[in-house]
Amino acid sequence: MACGNGHNAEGRYAGVAPEAGIVSVKILDRYGQGNSTHAVLGLRWIMDNAHKYNIKVVNLSIGTNDRKVNLPLKEAVERLWQMGIVVVAAAGNPDGRNGYRPPPAVSGGVISVGAWEDRSYFLAPAFPLFSRERDVLPDLWAPGEDIISVLSPDFDFTLPNRSRKNIVDENYITMSGASMATPLISGAAALLLAENPHTRPAEIKRLLLQKAKPFGGLLTAEVCRTI
């Protein structure tokens, strides 16, 4: 979604920044499960190897409901931000509890992303289906419903909100949520950096917010903006 080149899809599906390189850092198990300790270790690996692999943007389509792990994740992403690396994090999905931006999206050193679906625009003043509506709103919203993504051979269909009906073909599947919206913003950040490689993260964030459009019918244009 962020930088797929569409090779496996014969050009039918491509990411926002298809010429960007990908450095995969494994912090989850084969079933997509993990913990904050592994997440922090992964972020520290990026700190140590950012120059070697020319890492400019970090996409974090992860989150936790455990606020006790806030500090180590917050410190790790803010360190990356200070190093000049743009960090883009999913702002979470509603689950019946009080809404808030979960770690690591709660940090000031990130661009936090919520997801919107087409119907949300016409349900004002309701909030987007896939984004938390209280406490702190995401910096940006991006499309997050039925997004086509790569299908892993180990994809666990026994987990909630996963269905074989979403399979597109042997290589692709559609999924929904903030984790799917986040790579779209990461790709947009990569495009900005391709034009101006030395731009600092705060300026990338400012440019994205500046170019985003007010999300019609949701609160005010100042706090609800979408790409």
State where each predicted segment sits:
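Active-site-proximal beta-strand/loop segments in catalytic clefts of secreted hydrolases
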Residues: 1-5, 25-29, 60-64, 89-94, ...
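Subtilisin-like serine protease catalytic core
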Residues: 1-37, 53-56, 69, 106-110, ...
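C-terminal subdomain of the subtilisin-like protease fold in secreted/lumenal serine endopeptidases
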Residues: 55-61, 171, 194-227
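Substrate-binding/access-modulating region of protease and related hydrolase catalytic domains
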Residues: 9, 27-109, 120, 166-182
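Sec-exported extracytoplasmic/periplasmic mature domains
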Residues: 3-7, 44-51, 78-82, 115-118, ...
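Extracellular S/T/G-rich loop segment that most often corresponds to the catalytic His/Ser-adjacent loop
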Residues: 105-190, 194
